[in-house]
Amino acid sequence: MAQWTLDPAHSEIRFKVKHLVISTVTGQFKRFSGTVEAQKSDFSDARITFEADIDSISTNNEQRDGHLKSPDFFDAAAFPKLSFESTSMTRKGDEVYVLAGEMTIRGTKRKITLDVRYNGTVKGFDGDVAGFEITGKLNRRDFGLRWNSLTETGGVVVSDEVRLDIGVELKMADVEALVAI
């Protein structure tokens, strides 16, 4: 079984949400980790775990970031991490997969599916490196992120739909180092 670790220096965990229905706010988590175990070289049997630190959320606006960390949204003090654990990775075509799993945000676990594009594996400076692009959507209210407000015209400030846009680079884990631990 090959073991891989997510390379945070070459990965991005981004999200997008509509603001006032007319514009998009983009954010990211800056601290995260993940592992992948796969027997097959095409990752079709991959088992994936991932978590991100809520306190690392950034939308390039300190006031908004503080609000996102508050009990109105993620409640970082009570729920410091979000996590994902895969249940299946199904090949749908050349280098295209559907990743199913359970996302936990704010203590609430829900099943989600994500679209995955496997960009290949190459020899990097420190061994094998694999690249992936992952996209998907989730409804923030499903995870208890319920805060919203209405504008004067009755529109919502923040949409319920959150789009995920994730770029991941994995490094093959040093098996000898793992055994020594």
Question: Which residues are covered by each model-predicted region?
Answer:
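Low-complexity, acidic/polar, glycine-enriched regions of mature
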Residues: 1-181
